[in-house]
Amino acid sequence: KEKWGYVDLYKDDLLEDKDFYFVHAVNRAPMLLNKKLFIEHLEHIDFSFAPFHCDDCELCLRAWLYGLKVGWYNAGFKSMVAGGMRIWNKGLMGFQEIKNRGKLYEMYKSSLEEITGLVTEANKTL
């Protein structure tokens, strides 16, 4: 099962009691970005994922490949099923999710091992 964007699938004993650890990707709600690093290294959000399913994962995976890190902090965010785009986009949501996950896989399938290694090494520093 894919773990990009799904923090509860990280069940590593070394991370179990931590409020922060490095992950492949985080969900944009909430997502904090360093503006200077974003502009210097990432430059843009990939709007080809519109209406905005997986663009957050794509940004995070790209960040790892550009030498940046992606961390997860327990901010108390609980729901990924209510509000936001889900209110107005119910008809396209399932289709767009499947389409964009396939696109994300094609974009990063050759980099998965590299990114996973970077995440693993970053977590060893905690």
Question: Which stretches of residues belong to each language-model region?
Answer:
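Catalytic cores of nucleotide-sugar-dependent glycosyltransferases that transfer UDP/GDP/TDP-activated
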Residues: K1, M31-L32, I45-F47, T116-L118
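A recurrent flexible, glycine/aromatic-enriched loop bordering the glycosyltransferase active site
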Residues: E2-K3, L9-K36, F52
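Intrinsically disordered, low-complexity regulatory regions of eukaryotic regulatory proteins
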Residues: Y6, H53-D56, F95
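Intrinsically disordered, low-complexity peptide-like regions
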Residues: Y6, L15-D17, I87, I98, ...
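Donor nucleotide-sugar recognition loop
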Residues: H24-R28, K35, I39-S79
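Non-catalytic N-terminal targeting/anchoring module and adjacent flexible stem/linker
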Residues: H53, K124-L126
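Catalytic core of nucleotide-sugar-dependent glycosyltransferases
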Residues: A75, K90-E121
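Mature extracytoplasmic/periplasmic domains
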Residues: M80-K90
